[in-house]
Amino acid sequence: ISVLSIVHDTMVDGPGFRTSIYCAGCPNHCPGCHNPQSWDISHGTMTSTDELMKEIMSDPFANVTFSGGDPMFQAKALPAGTRHQGAEQQEHLVLYGYLFENLVKNPEQLELLRQIDVLVDGPFVQALRDEDLFFRG
């Protein structure tokens, strides 16, 4: 999994304290994106599922957000990291740059969807930006 960064004890990427995993790679290139450095998958550091789980489980009470970039861009690698032994009690949230209707057409993305608790879908649309909306652009 190509990871840009991991932030522990954040409250910006979902409700409550979370561990946020910022995945590299996003083909959307939304105008006004707040994280354009995430677009290129090569900007991340290759991280094994075991390493990722050690980071997630270093705070077993924190929920988890997969952001980016677009975590669904690496959907094939992520399911093993979402429901690992010990992580069952954590809420797993994914921020996704496409619409749900597109996600269910891709078998790898659909498998990841089955493993998570919350999906925030849709591309960032600068004209609709509202700073009063939580966890959205």
Regions found by a protein language model. Give the residues of each.
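Surface-exposed, flexible loop/turn segments at secondary-structure boundaries
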Residues: 11, 100, 127
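Short secondary-structure boundary/capping segments
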Residues: 11, 56, 110, 132-135
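Classical nucleotidyltransferase
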Residues: 105, 113, 118-137
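N-terminal pre-triad scaffold of radical SAM enzymes
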Residues: 2-29
